[in-house]
Design a protein with these regions (language model features):
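Short, small-residue-biased leader/transition segments that mark boundaries at the very start
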Residues: 1-6
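Short, well-ordered secondary-structure micro-motifs
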Residues: 41-44, 64-66, 105-106
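Helix-to-beta-strand junctions that scaffold the AdoMet/dcAdoMet cofactor pocket
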Residues: 86-88
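S-adenosyl-L-methionine
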Residues: 9-52
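Mobile active-site "lid"/loop adjacent to the S-adenosyl-L-methionine
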Residues: 11, 33, 50-81
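Active-site proximal loops enriched in glycine and acidic residues that flank catalytic Cys/His/Asp
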Residues: 15, 33-35, 54-57, 64, ...
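C-terminal catalytic and target-recognition region of SAM-dependent MTase-like enzymes
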Residues: 90-149
């Protein structure tokens, strides 16, 4: 079995509904609404570890005290911090970004640098929406994944 922790306010309500609809009402899921960096720092202090991380950070945001989050400035420190949460033998680390200025190569470099000690492989690609009228793809962001060998 596995356990899951979801900490995004907008996703918690939606995910709870999906868990109930999927027969997972009593599954070991931690529902949290919290600042991500503060959550990660607390988990590190508690000695908790995770086998996988799925991250979908916002492009821009403001905290309750006016703190500003800009993905271009904050993503590297956040990923570096999150690597301290990983178990000794992690399965994967996934980052989705719907910021068109954050290219797949940046996510690949970031994951390759911060996950190097785990000896896995890195993949990154553009996220896009197909345009039916012309067969082209409208770029919407990037996805990067590190996975164990």
């Amino acid at each position: 079995g596995s356990e899951m922790c979801i900490r995004d306010r907008g996703m918690v309500t939606w995910a709870k509904e999906n868990a109930v609809a999927s027969g997972l009402k009593d599954a070991p899921i931690r529902w949290l609404v919290d600042d991500c960096v503060k959550f990660v720092e607390r988990e590190i202090r508690r000695g908790n570890h995770y086998d996988a991380i799925i991250m979908d950070p916002p492009s821009y945001g403001r905290g309750p005290k006016g703190e500003i989050w800009k993905i271009e400035e904050a993503i590297h420190p956040l990923v570096k911090l999150c690597t301290q949460l990983l178990s000794d033998d992690p399965l994967f680390f996934l980052i989705n970004s719907y910021t068109t200025g954050l290219q797949p190569a940046v996510l690949a470099y970031l994951l390759g640098t911060e996950m190097k000690r785990f000896h896995g492989k890195v993949m990154a690609e553009e996220i896009g929406l197909p345009v039916s009228s012309n067969g082209l793809v409208l770029p919407c962001g990037a996805s990067g994944r590190w996975e164990s060998l």
